[in-house]
Amino acid sequence: MLKVEDMSHGEMHELLERQSFGHLGCAREGRPYVVPMNYAFDGKDLFFFTTEGMKTHFIDANPEVCLQVEEVTDPAHWRSVMVNGRAEKLTQTEEVQHAMQSIVKRNPSLTPAISATTMDTWGRAVDIALYRIVPEIMDGRKTV
């Protein structure tokens, strides 16, 4: 039988620092939307970088989001953390610089947000968005 237990605060922070990929959940008008997402964790806040599109429209309409991060060795050995909070679009220079430094450290190529798709069909650059999630609720589970 598989035994699952709560993760400590420290274990959750370690997992968020060790990983850089999760699933961002948001909702608009009662419709959920979940997307894979690269992120960075600075020990306090989570940051993510994306191009304008469906997820930014959902977040602009309802900034309450959750980020689920996992580490799976096999079906019997895994850890998972769920972070709930508000996504705040960053616009202040100092905040943007701090967030981008954290993100580039974890994901130097900024993929997949920066790719060939950052140009529209007319060759114009697509707008980008940078967000911070301040964790309000954090839960974690692991197998033992």
Report residues per predicted region.
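Charged, gly/pro-rich active-site loop segments
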Residues: 2, 75-144
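Short secondary-structure boundary/capping segments
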Residues: 13, 38, 56-57, 73, ...
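Amphipathic alpha-helical interface surfaces
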Residues: 12, 55-58, 95-99
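Extreme N-terminal tail/first-helix region
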Residues: 1-18
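Short beta-strand segments
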Residues: 19-51, 67-68
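Helix-adjacent hinge/juxtasegments
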Residues: 48, 54-81
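Structural motif corresponding to alpha-helix initiation and N-cap regions
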Residues: 9, 52-53
